[in-house]
């Protein structure tokens, strides 16, 4: 009887964990090394067709200045969308959610996200971590 209760409790706990994990569909899409000089062609390519509704940006290992970002969709016409990104992100700071692909009727796959910007206040290259939510 005790083993049945232990198994039942274990199954319930496992189901609770899996529902929490499913509710939080945040995935690291990739990391970009930010050069010290202003660069406008930093691309994060998404190899698998992925519908992403919004992204967050985190500055790892240095401060970052951004002058722009765009998202490109896998469509016949290579559609793109400019993103409203903050001009600076301090080391360890994470931005709020930046909405993309807001047209729910036309779910488009993201093929790449490009950034313009550079590392500031560091002799090493900062890293820009891109987190996606689908």
Swiss-Prot record:
Leader sequence residues: 1-23
Keyword Signal (UniProt): yes
Pfam families the record matches: DUF2541
Keyword Signal carried by entry: yes
Keywords recorded for this protein, A-Z: Signal
Family statement: Belongs to the UPF0412 family.
NCBIfam families listed in its UniProt record: PRK10154.1
Record-linked HAMAP family: UPF0412
Protein name: UPF0412 protein YaaI
Record lineage: Bacteria, Pseudomonadati, Pseudomonadota, Gammaproteobacteria, Enterobacterales
Gene transcribed to yield this protein: yaaI
């Amino acid at each position: 009887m005790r083993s049945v209760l232990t198994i039942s409790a274990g199954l319930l706990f496992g189901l609770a964990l899996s529902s929490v994990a499913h509710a939080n569909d945040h995935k690291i899409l990739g990391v970009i090394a930010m050069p010290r000089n202003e660069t406008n062609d930093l691309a994060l390519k998404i190899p698998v067709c992925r519908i992403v509704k919004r992204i967050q940006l985190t500055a790892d290992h240095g401060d970052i200045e951004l002058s722009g970002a765009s998202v490109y969709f896998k469509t016949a016409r290579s559609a793109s969308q400019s993103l409203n990104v903050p001009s600076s992100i301090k080391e360890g700071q994470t931005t709020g959610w930046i909405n993309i692909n807001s047209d729910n009727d036309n779910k488009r796959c993201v093929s790449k996200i490009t950034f313009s910007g550079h590392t500031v206040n560091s002799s090493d290259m900062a890293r820009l971590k891109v987190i996606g939510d689908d």
